[in-house]
Design a protein with these regions (language model features):
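S-adenosyl-L-methionine-dependent methyltransferase catalytic core, i.e., the SAM/SAH-binding region
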Residues: 1-176
Length: 176
């Protein structure tokens, strides 16, 4: 809305998002302001979407908001956060790709450790991966609280930071 407020009458704002809930909210704005369009798409398809809108070569700016949103973190049913127990999903678009639970329960210990290190800079990545594999050998890891508990059993959080922060970040990035 703030960007739209700064656009002139001939300006256009095109938004891309993979989250169906964000698309639904954006459709309301699209209906209210002809200068705004929203598409359910990943940023990897930006060139294609710009071509579809006749905008190639006519773009004056691009703003990428590539993080997880507060509504995603605040809704336990989305499975993004360790703050409240929910299904272990973490997908921006719950209708596509592999859920975090599916990946956690299928990936090898080395792959899990690599993801935790590469995307979360988790120093205890190997110990966490080993604990996840041990835990899932008796019961599949399917809940955010379950995964957070496994991680907290291996590492202590830093002051002001939950033990699972880095690992959850890494898994969210990898899944999406």
């Amino acid at each position: 809305r703030a960007i739209l407020a700064q656009l002139g009458p001939d300006g256009r704002l095109l938004a891309l998002d993979r989250d169906p809930e964000a698309i639904a909210a954006g459709m309301q704005l699209q209906a209210a302001d002809h200068r705004f369009s929203i598409r359910q798409s990943g940023f990897s398809r930006l060139h294609e979407v710009l071509a579809e809108h006749g905008c190639l070569g006519r773009v004056h700016g691009i703003l990428l908001d590539i993080g997880v949103s507060s509504p995603q973190l605040d809704d336990p049913a989305r499975g993004f956060s360790f703050r409240a127990d929910g299904p272990l999903d973490m997908r921006m678009d719950p209708g596509s790709g592999q859920s975090a639970a599916d990946w956690i329960n299928a990936a090898g210990e080395k792959e899990i450790a690599t993801v935790l290190w590469r995307y979360g800079e988790e120093r205890a990545s190997r110990r966490i991966a080993q604990a996840i594999c041990t835990a899932r050998s008796t019961e599949p890891v399917v809940r955010t609280g379950q995964l957070a508990g496994i991680i907290a059993g291996v590492v202590r959080g830093e002051p002001g930071r939950h033990a699972a922060t880095r690992s959850f970040q890494a898994i969210r990035i990898y899944i999406n």
